[in-house]
Amino acid sequence: MPRFENSFVVDQQIDSVWKFYTDIKHLEIITPKKLELKIIKCTNPEIILGQECWIEGKIIMKKIKWHSKITFFRKHEYTDEMIEGPFKKWIHTHRFSDLGNMKTKIIDEIEYELPFGLLRKMLNKYSKIQLEKIFNHRKNITCLKLNKK
C-alpha cells in the first residue's frame, strides 16, 4: 500500500499550531484553491475523537465527495480515516512535535490505496506528485498564517 510522508517546521509554539489545526476550518484555508474544497458538514467544529466530516472538492477536474472520521485523538496527534470517497483506503495521521525555541514540527503520514485495479500503478505515481504539490501548498500557507512575526 502506498505511503506519503511530509514534514516541515513552523516558527510558532506548539499550542498555537495545535489550535489552528484542530479547528476544522483550517482545511479550507490550507488547501489549494483549485481543489475547491468546501466543508459541507461536521459533527463538531473542533477536531475530536469520533468527529465526522463531509467535504466536497475537485480531483482531476471532477467534483468528489469525501466522508471522514477521526479515529484516533490525543494531544498533538490525530488520525482521520476516509469512510467514503475517491480512494479505496485513506488513513491520514497528523502529528505535532515541540522543538523548543517557538518552533513546531508538523508531520503528516498518509496510507492510501487507489481504486481502478490495473490503472492503480500508473495512478500511484500521479497521486504522489499531486500530494507533494498539495502538501507544499499547505506548508506555505501554514507558515504564512502561523510564523511568528
Language-model regions: role of each:
Residues 58-103, 148:
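Hydrophobic-ligand binding "helix-grip"
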Residues 140-149:
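Charged phosphate-binding loop/patch that engages nucleotide di/tri-phosphates or the phosphate backbone
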Residues 17-21, 27, 53, 70, ...:
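Hydrophobic pocket/interface hotspot
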Residues 4-6, 53-55, 66-68, 92, ...:
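Hydrophobic residues positioned within well-ordered beta-strands of beta-sheet architectures
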Residues 1-48:
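Hydrophobic ligand-binding cavity/cleft-lining segments
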Residues 7-11, 69-71, 95-97, 111-113:
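Generic structural detector for well-ordered beta-strands
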Residues 3-4, 37-40, 53-54, 78-79, ...:
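Short structured motifs
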Residues 82-133:
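Beta-strand/loop substructures that line and gate deep hydrophobic ligand-binding cavities in soluble
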